[in-house]
Amino acid sequence: ALGAAFTLRHRIPETSANSLEPYFHPRMLAFGLGALAVAALLRRRAWTAVALVAVAAPVHVTTALWFAVLVGVALAVLDLKMRRLGALGVVVAMVLLAVAAAVGPLNGSLTVMDDTWLQAVASKDSLFATLWPAWAWVANLGSLGLLWWAHGARTGRGQCTKEDVALAWGATALVALFLLTLPLVAARVALP
């Protein structure tokens, strides 16, 4: 089923993301490494999963970031030691980000888009999720609802594994992270 899904290509509603690119882009290689990381997680090879996400980072950093959240949360759900390491990693990353924003290389890099900037990106309907029509919200958030419905069905049949639960929570964390960015999107804050 996963192989068949990879043959499909469609634009994810109101985003600039496609389920699969029609050409080879570094994002596709990073996605492949992320998919291998998920496979490693399913086989409880935690450090292999972490290494695969790390290798994906220089290939395409944002794709690797999404897999880091998915796999990182899943590993934290599965393993207490990984949960502690993950919590420490999040704290260290937040401190480094705060320092970089306050006095380091990111100081002053957050900018509010002005009218000229907004005109330049006006055709990019994917940039401002706060302007999405209701159907796009239903389609995009409905994917998470569908995931949890399928998870509930597998649980009811006794087919659910701990890895399934962990990945469902990882996917939920991705959606939560997206939702947390909405105030910045509404304020038209541009990231460096």
For the regions a protein language model found, what residue spans apply to each?
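Membrane-interface micro-motifs in multi-pass membrane enzymes
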Residues: A1-L41, P192
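Hydrophobic faces of alpha-helical transmembrane segments in multi-pass integral membrane proteins
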Residues: L2-A4, L29, L33-G34, V55, ...
